């Protein structure tokens, strides 16, 4: 998982990174985020930002499929501009990309739930509606 967050999100990102480690994710982060993670005991590999001009950078890792989840919060127009190539490559690679900690927290919770319970079934929304029609309005779907 790649994590790069604005300063005000760093404390909450530490908890998320720790939870991702429990799910066997390897953490890759930009220097500032990695420093904070390491201070709280979360192993994090440092990766270059694209704007730093050093290779490999985060887009290289995305292109090589070395990252399978992205958490990236930004502040200010310059940071948003800088993350354009990151967003583009993430989209092209079909990698889950979270731009808020609320969304990332929900995703991590879902991954934890999935790991804890193997007793689940994936269904399409259409299947849920069909089942509701079959059972009537009192049904629990």
Spans of model-derived segments:
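ATP-dependent carboxylate/acyl-activation modules
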Residues: 1-98, 104-107, 113-141
């Amino acid at each position: 998982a790649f994590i790069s967050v604005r300063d005000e999100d760093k404390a909450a990102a530490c908890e998320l990174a720790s939870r991702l480690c429990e799910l066997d994710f390897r953490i890759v982060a930009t220097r500032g985020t990695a420093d904070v993670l390491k201070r709280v005991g979360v192993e994090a590999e440092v990766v270059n930002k694209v704007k730093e001009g050093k290779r490999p950078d985060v887009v290289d890792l995305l292109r090589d499929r070395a990252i399978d989840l992205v958490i990236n919060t930004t502040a200010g127009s310059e940071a948003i501009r800088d993350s354009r190539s990151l967003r583009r490559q993430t989209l092209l690679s079909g990698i889950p990309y979270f731009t808020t900690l609320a969304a990332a927290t929900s995703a991590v919770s879902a991954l934890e739930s999935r790991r804890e319970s193997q007793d689940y079934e994936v269904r399409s929304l259409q299947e849920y509606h069909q089942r509701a029609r079959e059972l009537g309005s009192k049904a629990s779907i």
